[in-house]
């Protein structure tokens, strides 16, 4: 019998983030408490999002609106990292970044967790920014997925290529 396997990745669907950003921009433009504050939200490069407003509290509220839209689109908050408001002239800015991929440090932590607490006979292999998990039994792989979903890790995980 051949080994079964799956890959652990940390990727964010950019289209879903774009939809959340557009919904947040629409809400910021129409909400009464944001009128007259020049609050904007926009992409800044491929992985960064910039929020600007005239006051520090309004820019924090704009971050909360954006996070709410991300949650509604099933995007984990672990995948979005918002900085602190920074004053620049008459406006306040928050730069947020999307976290893509599993860092080598996080990958080592995940493989150690699988080795220590997972079922015996499960093999892990780090392949760049993803982890391949293989075993002879599919039940063992499902147990690993359940264990990782329960674990408190600092990255958003998705499980793909389950074979």
From Swiss-Prot:
UniProt cross-references to InterPro entries, sorted A to Z: DUF520, UPF0234-like_C, UPF0234_N, YajQ-like_sf
GO CC, alphabetical: cytosol
A Pfam family recorded for this sequence: DUF520
Entries under CDD domains matching the protein: YajQ_like
Keywords linked to the UniProt accession: Nucleotide-binding
Gene3D superfamilies: 3.30.70.860, YajQ-like, domain 2
Function: Nucleotide-binding protein.
Xref: HAMAP family: YajQ
Family: Belongs to the YajQ family.
Descriptive protein name: Nucleotide-binding protein MAP_4063c
């Amino acid at each position: 019998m051949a080994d079964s396997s799956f890959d652990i990745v940390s990727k964010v669907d950019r289209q879903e983030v774009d939809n959340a950003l557009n919904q947040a921009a629409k809400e910021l433009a129409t909400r009464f408490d944001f009128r007259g504050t020049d609050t904007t939200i926009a992409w800044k490069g491929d992985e960064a999002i910039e929020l600007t407003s005239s006051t520090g509290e309004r820019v924090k509220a704009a971050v909360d609106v954006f996070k709410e839209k991300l949650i509604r689109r099933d995007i984990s908050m672990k995948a979005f990292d918002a900085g602190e408001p920074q004053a620049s002239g008459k406006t306040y800015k928050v730069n947020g970044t999307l976290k893509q991929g599993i860092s080598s440090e996080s990958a080592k932590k995940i493989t150690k967790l699988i080795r220590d607490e997972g079922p015996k006979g499960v093999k892990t292999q780090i392949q760049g920014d993803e982890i391949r998990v293989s075993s002879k039994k599919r039940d063992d792989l499902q147990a690993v997925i359940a264990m990782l979903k329960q674990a408190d890790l600092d990255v958003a995980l998705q499980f793909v290529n389950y074979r």
